[in-house]
UniProtKB/Swiss-Prot annotation:
Catalyzes the attachment of valine to tRNA(Val). As ValRS can inadvertently accommodate and process structurally similar amino acids such as threonine, to avoid such errors, it has a 'posttransfer' editing activity that hydrolyzes mischarged Thr-tRNA(Val) in a tRNA-dependent manner. Monomer. A motif ('HIGH' region) lies at residues 48-58. Its main location: cytoplasm. This is Valine--tRNA ligase.
Amino acid sequence: MNDNINIAKTYDPKEFEERIYKMWEEGEYFTPKVDKDKKPYTIVMPPPNITGKLHLGHALDNSMQDFLIRVKRMQGYSTLWLPGQDHASIATEVKVENELLKTGLKKKEMGREAFLERVWEWSEEYRGRIRDQLKKLGSSADFTRESFTMDDNLDKAVRAVFVKLYEEGLIYKGNRIVNWCPKCMTALSDAEIEYEENYGNFWHVKYPLVDSEEYLEIATTRPETMLGDTAVAVNPNDERYKHLIGKKLMLPLVNREIPIVADDYVDVEFGTGAVKITPAHDPNDYEVGKRHDLEEIIIMNENGTINELGGKYSGMDRYEARKAIVEDLKKEGFLVKVKEHIHNVSCHDRCNTIIEPMISKQWYVKMKELAKPAIEVVKSGEIKFVPERFDKTYFNWMENIQDWCISRQLWWGHRIPVWYCKDCGETIVSLEEAKKCSKCSSENLIQDEDVLDTWFSSALWPFSTLGWPDKTEDLEYFYPTDVLATGYDIIFFWVARMIFSGLHNMKEIPFKTVLIHGIVRDSEGKKMSKSLGNGVDPLEVIDKYGADALRFMLITGNAPGNDIRFYEERVESARNFANKIWNASRYVMMNLDKNLMEKYKDCKDYNIADTWILSRLNEVIKEVTDNIEKFELGMASQKVYDFMWNEFCDWYIELSKPVLYGEDEKAKGVTFNVLFNVLTSGLKLLHPIMPFITEEIFINIQEEEKTITTSKWPEFKEELKNEEVEKKMSHVIEAIKAIRNVRIEMDVPPSRKAKIMIYALDGIDAFKDGKIYFEKLASASEVEFLNSKEEAPENAVSAVTKGAEIYIPLFDLVDLEKEMERLNKEREKLEKEIERVDKKLSNENFVKKAPEAVVNEEKAKGEKYKEMLEAVLERIKSLK
């Protein structure tokens, strides 16, 4: 056995993945230095929440980012992929609270300080887990620069931005409608809400007019909110109610007079066309209330019970009150009917409690002014969305933006940097802890109890992680970042906020490209969730198949912005591909003769197969690089796969064997070099997708470079492109395939050689150059070239390809009837194909609407099939 083989006989990723990652860390290959002679390339990793382990969505997101980073590192950029984690305020608080409840401890009983100590312990544990998981995936991130949204320097950035916005008049405290969780007793962002289909009711209720027998019938799904009604709205164009606009109604059970107002918000076709308006407990009603200057009556406590304004229902839970109110409406004759109704109900995604829209005094950011420049940078193309269609999603939100509620009634998170003087009531907003009242000099101060929305700190991620507000070397060199890869579900909540935060605080965009990916669904297309039990743990997949196989499955065939389905069979196929590369590499290592390689390293006397594979490699380098630049990572990955499996492993390695096992020293030396160069170039193209296997092979097949991670990315070379040889070689390969298929159909074993006679349809040179390959790969005892079809023997089996007609005198080996049967099957197959093409081309819609190239391709197929059919019919005729 050749002593060049330094890799194990069988492919086992468990044997080397951990060792390889350790080698990378020790080599500091992922820790870039500020190098003014190199261009920087930066990606900040979307920080995973410290609420548990990573899922397949994280695996997809990070595989895509790692793909880009590894390519740019090999292209000579100073690449920084900055990792980190998000403190995930409410999500983490709920998790820790639930863990404590298992031991009988309650958050409120522990007190803020003791509870936060437990959360910090949790964060340390889960940050470590996330870090380990990212490394197992092969992420080439710089963990020496890892950030956490609760780090001191990030907290400093958060306070600096809050104070700046407050001083600019862009942060204020006021009453607005919020999503309120009665269980967690905090305001929530829209991102923390899930919608569940709910089987409820529409209660139709009479609202009588004051001093009249008339009434309006309204329909509501939340009768308990009647207690806070301050109007009923109708559409100004609704003929049924025009005469009632401006009149008063008596609110049932409450006996409060409320007006009938006209508002375009009301849909004439929906329900009864009359809508009860509860400004304090519905976001749409809130807007109607503002337009008509209606009173805002809050009828609930923070825990979801009815407050003192609810009269006899005071103290009841909201659903208890609902039952009591419906019963009373029925008793007093106000309930008209009850209709079953299916509708979506908003729930807190962490505790599954139904949300109560409620007016609450919170801290807000004024958004209109901040949104304008953020819209402009996308419109101008300074920031690009990939795919472009997602900029519409972005514009839709930004152009209809509301003020952002940034306060949360929680303990875990960035405490709002606001203090209140207990003596004079002054509000002090300060970067540092306030010690003395700026108005009365009192030291009797108390800090605001609330923390900031998690997204507030996340919005600063691209620059706070690089040291801002300090002017650091990293910030100057690596900002703005290049690409943000993220899911389409957080364009509103995170991407948009990073854009306006970067523009407002850095006066620069935070990134140049937003690469959007979809979500990973199960094999049936369902969203993965704990409740459905269809989630897949990426670590379990890695343990079974290796990280490279999982990465390859997630990236290959995946188009930007589209959801993907997870099939374990595809991961297994990816592992089979890795195994193929492993075995091909062992073949190359086993046969390489370093002395001959060195002797003929500058020799360019390539045979047709050498020229062909170098030309194909060159074209693939161009296609892969172009696709990466367009962020078509799935397409790039597929191109590498097709080349390495179908062209290099399946064909070139086989084509190299006659040379390597021959006697021509120079030919062997040249082919050794081609084998080596094509394999190492292929490994480099594959490296961003499958980093572990490519590194293990690379460091064992050559000695000049310590790692593939910093080796040079392959470049397109015009002089290696040879379309003529590619065409010739495709004819040879098609002919060999055809001969093999015939032999298989005829049950002729490879050991039984037979003469092959070739009539070339498109020049005979290709087939003459490939003569040796017919002998070695098609079991040819002899190869004869015919000048015309008439020279073909009558007693021969035939095969037709697009470049040749091939005849094999096999009648002493095969059954004549069997050959006729085979030819008739081929005839039927070709007739069906011709019928299909003719039908397509006779379809006017297809010819008019399909691209010209597609129509021409169909025409060419039709001509080819007709030629092949003609040849088959001739053979049938000759055998009769």
